Amino acid sequence: MGQFFAYATVITVKENDHVA
């Protein structure tokens, strides 16, 4: 479960960086 959360966090960070 923690691994999934970590993966989701990385995706979110990438998306935010792309938008910015």
Curated annotation (Swiss-Prot):
It comes from the Bacteria. Keywords: Stress response. InterPro entries: YoeI-like. Induction: In exponential phase repressed in minimal glycerol medium, repressed in low oxygen (at protein level). NCBIfam families: small_mem_YoeI (NF033439). This is Uncharacterized protein YoeI. It comes from Escherichia coli (strain K12). The gene is yoeI.
